[in-house]
A protein has these predicted regions:
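Mature extracellular/periplasmic domains of secretome proteins
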Residues: 118-125, 145-147, 211-215, 233-258, ...
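Active-site glycine-centered loops adjacent to acidic/histidine catalytic or metal-binding residues
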Residues: 134, 296, 511
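Extracellular S/T/G-rich loop segment that most often corresponds to the catalytic His/Ser-adjacent loop
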Residues: 157-174, 301-402, 414-415, 439-524
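Hydrolase catalytic cores
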Residues: 197-200, 221-229, 245-258, 340-342, ...
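Edge beta-strands of jelly-roll/beta-sandwich modules across compartments, strongly enriched
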Residues: 420-431
Length: 576
């Protein structure tokens, strides 16, 4: 591309300027790139008809979502022309998302509600969809089958194909597992989705009811993320398509739905303003639904640093340790656009790699600069605010010239020149893609929650240890950067949670991935009580969240609200 468009996000603009061999060194920068066809998966915000784009770009494919959001697969050489279309408001690169990995039921006060009788029986999630958007599911597991052996899964979507309950029942009736998988070829090798589904809605049949989930009679919608095209890594484009699929199925069947998302990443300003976050916030208001999202497990990972610059301080040094054998490091620096700050990058030997002179006239914005130090190439993109982002991002990509990035302590010096607010924040990519000792030497504990749990209209869920009744130290913390919005909204049990495992048994895991489905199941119970049983026809969306927050109780020693635990632990409201 000869011209860089203000409509394209920073990581994509940098990625489009790198040679393919450089691009492939970074899993973050290459997310969404299809080498064989030289095409990119993209997220678009559109004002107008997607049909116009289909006619103008017949070599591309577009999938229309709600509210003017579109996912697309576009040849690289057509992206600049696409961005030039008046109807295209903004384009974002998809990001890789990672998982956040019987006691919990009782700790959340859900057990009494499951026993409490209503005019039509106990609260069990009956008549409310629970949607699991995850790594798949072991649909053979007894906990996802009825007493007659039929499936509790109403719809299963994987690898671009949809399977109905009737098709799953046909597979379950096959003479052996191989024959069944030839009919419905869906598995869950990691077991993550199976475990999450069991917490939210497993019926406990394999344990005689002992390991029963929350909404144990809810019908399930399951969407498996990750495709061969994305190398098996789930992308934010696929997450958005999955949410859209679930919403449309729920509307078709006129059933409320509680959606579980136990995935996240670190890319973004953590202010709820990316296309993924704004999409989730607007779709949450389109139907009788609740969306619960885990805050991730970055609470102790040293992947974030934030602070406030002073006009009276000459400079601030931020030290970043890079471990040995690191194949790539990606760093975002965010600040308010009205603050003028020069940046200096020092190599591990304290030699100056580059100095960026910020300009009050915006000189240098939209530009890419590349530098070399020993075995490391440093590519830097200086972005400007976007139609959806009032903050300024400077994106760093540390890539090896041969095998690994140079280990040692790199230093970013911030030299304030004109400060109106002074807030700044830095994030590294999600911890699962970095070695153990890579991180900031003076890391910040606050605002370590992952995107998209930062979206405004979702229920953001952290984790606590229900045995000790204390915050789980790994759980991603709030509040939202700069805005101060209270996130997480609340916490749920996330330490040593026993739930379903592929093969028919159970396994114990920890993480916000395990906490989130407790809240998803709770949401299904509230919707059953309110919508199906006539107690509150509007018990969904923000009103449902309000019910959960009203019923939340503080953990011992935690203020309310707390950056660690939000408004407290998920103690589902007293319905009678």
């Amino acid at each position: 591309m000869d011209v860089i468009s203000d409509k394209i996000d920073a990581s994509l603009q940098l990625a489009l300027q790198l040679p393919t061999e450089e691009l492939e060194k970074s899993g973050s920068l290459s997310a969404g790139y299809e080498k064989e066809s030289q095409s990119w998966e993209l997220i678009l915000r559109l004002a107008g008809s997607v049909q116009t784009l289909r006619q103008a770009f017949p070599q591309a494919s577009f999938q229309e979502l709600s509210g003017g959001y579109v996912t697309a697969l576009v040849p690289e050489d057509a992206i600049e022309a696409l961005a030039a279309q008046d109807s295209v408001i903004y384009i974002e690169q998809p990001k890789r998302i990672v998982t956040g990995v019987a006691q919990g039921v009782r700790a959340s006060c859900i057990w009494p509600l499951q026993q409490e009788m209503t005019p039509v029986g106990p609260l069990s999630g009956r008549g409310i969809f629970v949607a699991i958007i995850d790594s798949g599911i072991d649909y053979f597991h007894p906990d996802f089958r009825n007493a007659d052996g039929s499936s509790r899964i109403a719809w299963l979507f994987a690898d671009g194909k949809e399977y109905s309950k009737a098709q799953i029942d046909q597979a379950l009736a096959a003479e052996d597992r191989t024959s069944a998988l030839s009919l419905v070829p869906v598995t869950d090798p990691s077991g993550h989705g199976t475990h999450v589904a069991g917490i939210a809605a497993g019926n406990g049949r394999a344990s005689g009811g002992r390991n029963r989930g929350v909404a144990y009679e809810s019908p399930l919608i399951v969407v498996k993320l990750g495709t061969a095209r994305s190398g098996g890594f789930p992308l934010t484009t696929q997450l958005m398509e999955a949410v859209e699929y679930v919403k449309r199925k729920s509307i078709e069947e006129r059933k409320p739905v509680a959606i579980n998302i136990s995935f996240g990443n670190n890319y973004g300003s953590h202010t709820g303003t990316s296309l993924l976050e704004t999409y989730l916030s607007q779709v949450a208001n389109q139907w009788k639904m609740a969306i619960a999202i885990g805050t991730g497990n970055e609470g102790q990972e040293a992947l974030h640093q934030q602070g406030r610059l002073s006009a009276f301080r000459q400079e601030l040094g931020i030290e970043l340790a890079v471990d040995v054998y690191e194949t790539s490091v990606n760093l975002q620096f965010w600040k308010r656009y009205q603050d003028v700050v020069d940046l200096v990058l020092l190599a591990p030997d304290q030699s100056q790699v580059f100095r960026f002179l910020d300009s009050e006239q915006g000189v240098g914005e939209g530009q890419i600069a590349s530098y070399v130090w020993n075995n490391t190439e440093i590519h830097v993109f200086f972005d400007a605010p976007s139609p959806y982002q009032i903050y300024q991002e400077i994106y760093f990509a540390f890539l090896p010239r041969t095998d690994y990035v140079d280990a040692g302590v790199w230093t970013i010096r911030l030299l304030p020149r004109r400060i109106k607010d002074g807030s700044y924040a830095l994030w590294l990519q999600t911890g699962g893609s970095l070695n153990e000792n890579t991180g900031f030497l003076q890391a910040s504990e606050e605002t370590t929650l992952t995107v998209p749990s930062t979206a405004d209209k979702v229920i953001s869920v952290g984790a606590y240890d229900s045995r000790r009744n204390q915050y789980a130290s790994f759980s991603g913390r709030g509040f939202a950067w700069v805005t101060g919005e209270v996130k997480p909204d609340l916490v749920a049990p996330g330490v040593d949670i026993t739930s379903c495992a592929p093969g028919g048994g159970y396994v114990t895991r920890s993480g916000t991935s395990m906490a989130t489905p407790f809240v998803t199941g709770s949401a299904a119970l509230i919707m059953q009580w309110g919508i199906l049983e006539g107690n509150d026809s509007y018990a969904y969306g923000e009103k449902l969240k309000a019910y959960l927050l009203r019923g939340a109780l503080p953990l011992l020693g935690e203020p309310m609200p707390s950056e660690r635990t939000g408004w407290g632990e998920d103690v589902i409201i007293r319905l009678h």
